[in-house]
From Swiss-Prot:
Binding site for Zn(2+): C890, C892, C901, H902
NCBIfam families: PRK12904.1, secA
Cofactor notes: May bind 1 zinc ion per subunit.
Role this protein plays: Part of the Sec protein translocase complex. Interacts with the SecYEG preprotein conducting channel. Has a central role in coupling the hydrolysis of ATP to the transfer of proteins into and across the cell membrane, serving both as a receptor for the preprotein-SecB complex and as an ATP-driven molecular motor driving the stepwise translocation of polypeptide chains across the membrane.
Gene name of the record: secA
Catalytic activity: ATP + H2O + cellular proteinSide 1 = ADP + phosphate + cellular proteinSide 2
Disulfide bonds: none
SUPFAM superfamilies with a match to the protein in the record: Helical scaffold and wing domains of SecA, P-loop containing nucleoside triphosphate hydrolases, Pre-protein crosslinking domain of SecA
Catalytic activity, EC: 7.4.2.8
HAMAP family, per database record: SecA
Record protein name field: Protein translocase subunit SecA
GO molecular function, one term: ATP binding
UniProt similarity note: Belongs to the SecA family.
Keyword Nuclease in annotation: no
């Protein structure tokens, strides 16, 4: 039965269809301009950039320039890259310009599509950032598309690992900058740890287009970027705690895979208590006494490291280090570390060198970093399933862009087996059959371990020539994935390794040219060889098409439908045929943890025999339901985390804005005076409460505060004896004395040095207190959840207490800054005492009138070519004097020592 909603969609079309229809009309207007632009010479086409910029300077909007700018970029792409953006790419480009997310199928040309809004928005000169997931893609796209932008007179930079500040600053100053989300985020944090504007590398955040937007803004949303500094080395303690876990029995702990938690049972707690007591690390009577909080934290981390984290799935061991594996892409994430001691627990488990724990110096989540841009948009092959999250958190509307040619891929129903063993036997049979008929196969696995187990099975079965692509072989990723479309190729890949590189049937021309002709110079020979490679690829493509196109065979379903859709989407690009199928078992993680018991019972009733599969659309629907449940739970987690991070983010913005203001201030006298007066007011109100009797005054405490915070010795005891003196009078006298001392110091230092000192003290103190504040917020975050048991809202509690901590930090800042400024003194280093020659004197020879002492000095140093004999020196020409000792009489004849005469000007 058709619902009213379904009926309405049939008649009027979905909101997506209506939006696409409107944009298609605009795309047709741009296409109508194509003939005009084809008739322009290269010089006339290039002159369009200056013409558009002049129009913007006169007040025209980017929207009004869009048709002509898109037509210009399209024509330039045809001439420079040999590629013409289709109308659907124009539609996608408009979505990106209008702060949206363009969902385009794999192979539809997202990289080329992005050049249209990038060119248009770069005309403003405020900077456009194109964000990708790794350095390889950033460099590749900057080089390839950079030819188009350079042709149109725009500058292009690329931010990648290993650049120094000057190189980064130059790249950010370009009209268009390519870079990874990590590099951009860390540059922002590093900029906000600098002490001068000139040292900063980034410009204000204007416009960003995020490639693989779902991966960056959703999969990595929970991962904060953290710059940290090392704390004390506690590797012995981690190793000791680690020895307690392997001997534990199953009854000693409980693991909840769904919630990803591991906790000790009562029996387990008693066991580790005894072990700790024997090692001398148990304080008090019980493990859960307040003195053992840190020990409990380390024990829980060690338990999680052993029971929740799997080697070759969650991390790998490489070069004596634990390298985290991205659970969504299967890529290694070198440089990333788990926080709060978990990474050290994994290092202890795997017996590699334990790195010291780190203190957070600065941090930000991708959610909050990308929300700083004035304008944000993104593109991906799969975003529709997360449309609600993109809308709620980033205010981005997802639009599904129609394909240029109809999709010919056949998505087959899942095959479900009872056991993993049966499933793998079926997979190997299917791979053998497809391989023998010459069909290229992409096999998707969920972990390194599983990809290598499958590879071993294929070896045992005698299937040769397959490639394994996982985090271990990250360096060859692009080449392996690019050749996955060759007839008979079998490529085993973890999750979405290789995203960003197209799988083209017959092979990838660009990759083969790079690989096979790297040492062949430009010329007829190279052109001939490229033509031969093209012909070979065309022949191989025909074979692959005849075999049915690319076959995507997935060995397991992921928690997220989006990741499954990404894998499916590798097949059937640009109208090519293809097929996809998922092989599952009841022992798979998703089925075991989230699948309903009803499905298990249903399969048992059917009485499946060994190696027999069940295939039915109902199974697909039940699995999709389980995936939706997981997605909803993960969305709630991310949304909740963002609410907490927003509290810190508001404070971060205040602090970072304050730092920028300090950098720009040329005179901080008023700011410092205000801080000084606030410190004095707080001091007086604490020791002499308003309207309190004189007997209640703490004069001794006030005197001590004045000495410690203002470095002054004031006769407050005498003032207290005066008849009728009130707290305001104390306040005014202390302010007057402190202002006088500060003014005298400023006069001694001079305005330039004083401003430099004030700026340095304020910013260093602010940075140190902010770091401590981040630690305090982390501690508050870790315990505030327990307030829920007392029927109090943890988020509101966190907001209230975080604000109080922030207020305390600002009060401490005033005290620390004023205390340091009232004590600071400039110590000028005395110049070293000059070494006098052994015979200091003057002896004029009566016969010659020459200074015998000068001759003696010259004789003493005659091995030095720069020494000129006194008789050869012209008193009127310093160029003839050569090297002169500082304590010699000046050769000019003044009678003064050289250092007090001509030497003083050196």
């Amino acid at each position: 039965m058709v619902s009213f909603g379904g009926l309405a969609r049939k008649i009027f079309g979905s909101s997506n269809d209506r939006r696409v229809k409107t944009l298609r009309q605009r795309a047709e207007q741009i296409t109508a301009l194509e003939k005009n632009y084809e008739n322009l010479t290269d010089e006339q086409l290039q002159a369009k950039t200056a013409e558009f910029r002049a129009a913007l300077a006169e007040g025209k909007s980017l929207d009004s320039l869009l048709p002509d700018a898109f037509a210009t970029a399209r024509e330039a792409a045809k001439r420079v890259l040999g590629m013409r953006p289709f109308d659907v790419q124009l539609i996608g480009g408009m979505v990106l310009h209008e702060r949206g997310i363009a969902e385009m199928r794999t192979g539809e040309g997202k990289t080329l599509m992005a050049t249209l809004p990038v060119y248009l928005n770069a005309l403003e000169g405020k900077g456009v950032h194109v964000v990708t997931v790794n350095d390889y893609l950033a460099t590749r796209d900057a080089e390839t598309m950079g030819r188009l932008y350079n042709f149109l007179g725009l500058t292009v930079g690329v931010i990648k690992h290993g650049l120094d500040d000057d190189e980064r600053r130059a790249a950010y100053a370009c009209d268009i900058t390519y870079g990874t989300n990590n590099e951009l985020g860390f540059d922002y944090l590093r900029d906000n740890m600098k002490y001068e504007r000139a040292q900063m590398v980034q410009r204000p955040h204007n416009y960003a287009i995020v490639d693989e937007v779902d991966s960056i803004l959703i999969d990595e949303a929970r991962t904060p970027l953290i710059i940290s500094g090392p704390l004390e080395d506690r590797s012995d303690f981690y190793n000791l705690i680690d020895t307690f876990i392997p001997p534990l029995a199953e009854e000693d702990y409980e693991v909840d895979e769904k919630q990803k938690t591991a906790i000790f049972t009562e029996v387990g707690t008693e066991k580790v208590e005894k072990l700790l007591e024997a090692a001398g690390h148990l304080k008090g009577e019980s493990l859960y006494d307040i003195e053992n909080v840190a020990v409990v934290h380390h024990l829980n981390n060690a338990l999680r490291a052993h029971k929740l984290f799997q080697r070759d799935k969650d991390y790998i061991v490489r070069n004596d280090e634990i390298v985290i594996i991205d659970e969504f892409t299967g890529r290694m994430m070198p440089g990333r570390r788990y926080s709060e001691g978990l990474h050290q627990a994994l290092e202890a488990k795997e017996h590699v060198t334990i790195q010291p724990e780190n203190q957070t110096l600065a941090s930000i989540t991708f959610q909050n970093y990308f929300r700083m841009y004035n304008k944000l948009s993104g593109m991906t092959g799969t975003a529709a399933t997360e449309a609600e999250e993109f809308g709620n958190i980033y205010g981005l509307e997802v639009l599904e862009i129609p394909t240029n040619l109809p999709v010919q891929r056949i998505d087959e129903d899942d095959e479900v087996y009872r056991t993993v063993e049966e499933k793998y036997r079926a997979i190997v049979r299917d791979i053998r059959a497809s391989h023998e008929k010459g069909q290229p196969i992409l096999v998707g696995t969920t972990s390194i371990e599983k990809s290598e187990q499958l590879a071993e099975r294929l070896r045992r079965e005698g299937i040769k020539g397959f490639q394994v692509l996982n985090a271990r072989y990250h360096e060859q990723e692009a080449y392996i994935i690019a050749q996955a479309g060759v007839p008979g190729a079998v490529t085993i890949a973890t999750n979405m390794a290789g995203r960003g590189t197209d799988i083209q049937l017959g092979g990838n021309l660009e990759m083969r040219v790079r690989q096979e002709l790297s040492d062949v110079p430009e010329g007829p020979e190279r052109e001939e060889k490229i033509a031969a490679i093209k012909a070979d690829i065309a022949q191989l493509k025909e074979k692959a098409l005849a075999a049915g196109g690319l076959y995507v065979l997935a060995t397991e379903r992921h928690e997220s439908r989006r990741i499954d859709n990404q894998l499916r989407g590798r097949s059937g690009r640009q109208g090519d045929p293809g097929r996809s199928k998922f092989f599952l078992s009841l022992q798979d993680d998703l089925m075991r943890i989230f699948g309903s018991d009803r499905m298990d019972g249903m399969l048992q009733k059917l009485g499946l025999k060994e190696d027999e599969a069940i295939v039915h659309p109902w199974i697909n629907k039940a699995l999709e339901k389980a995936q939706k449940k997981v997605e909803a739970r993960n969305f709630e987690i991310r949304k909740n985390l963002l609410k907490y991070d927003d509290v810190m983010n508001d404070q971060r913005k205040v602090i970072f804005e304050q730092r920028l203001e300090m950098m720009d201030e040329e005179d901080l006298t008023e700011t410092v005076a205000e801080m000084r007066h606030e410190v004095i007011e707080d001091m007086v109100i604490l020791r002499i409460p308003k309207d309190a009797y004189a007997e209640k005054w703490d004069i001794a405490g006030l005197k001590q505060d004045i000495a410690s915070k203002l470095n002054l010795d004031l006769p407050v005891e005498e003032w207290a004896k005066e008849e009728g003196i009130a707290e305001e009078e104390f306040e005014n006298r202390i302010k007057e004395a402190a202002d006088k001392a500060a003014a005298e110091k400023a006069e001694r230092f001079g305005p330039q040095i004083m401003t430099y000192v004030e700026k340095s003290v304020i910013m260093q103190s602010l940075d140190n207190l902010w770091r401590e504040h981040l630690v305090n917020l982390d501690h508050l975050r870790s315990v505030v959840g327990f307030r829920g048991y007392a029927q109090r809202d943890p988020l509101n509690e966190y907001k209230t207490e975080a604000f109080e901590l922030f207020q305390t930090m600002l009060a401490n800042l005033r005290e620390v800054v004023i205390s340091q400024l009232m004590r600071v003194e400039i110590v000028r280093e005395a110049p070293p005492e000059p070494q006098l020659p052994p015979m200091a004197g003057l002896h004029i020879d009566g016969a010659t009138g020459e200074n015998d002492f000068d001759e003696a000095i010259w004789a003493e140093h005659q091995h030095d070519d720069r020494i000129v004999p006194p008789a050869q020196r012209d008193p009127a020409d310093p160029r003839t004097w050569g090297k002169v000792s500082r304590n010699e009489p000046c050769p000019c004849g003044s009678g003064k020592k050289y250092k007090h005469c001509h030497g003083a000007f050196e």
